[in-house]
Amino acid sequence: MAKQNKIGIFTYMLNNYGAVLQSFALQHYLQTNGAADVEIVNFETIRHQQLNKIFRKYSDNFLVQLCFIMLTLLRYKQLKQRKIKTLLFKRKYMKFTRVYTSQTDLFSNLPEKDVYVSGSDQVFNPNGLNRDVYYL
């Protein structure tokens, strides 16, 4: 890989260990194999923000939502610690572009890169969010 390459990574980033470590590993691999600048494209819509909340709407069904809230309360401390740890890790070890909050925002202000990479198992989830962004 030529040293002048600027690479943008499109990935489905949630505050869980798997998503963060997968993104970090890809970014680190590209950096240590010759890329001059590697950034994760920080695409975070309102729906992404909702999914990253500890308490969120899980279902329209009242009983299902109530069960979700109760289970979340039982695991609140663990979920809060995980969220803090992943945010601190991302700040310390990972490089991101500015935040893009919509497809329109992203497509009209696409970060200038030589190469774009799409990664993460969730990028190819047929039920995933904003698939057009990740399918390059």
Locate the predicted segments by residue:
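Extreme N-terminus of proteins, especially the signal/transit-peptide cleavage junction
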Residues: M1-K6
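Aromatic- and Gly/Pro-rich donor/ligand-binding loops
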Residues: I7-Y17, L21-Q22, L26-L136
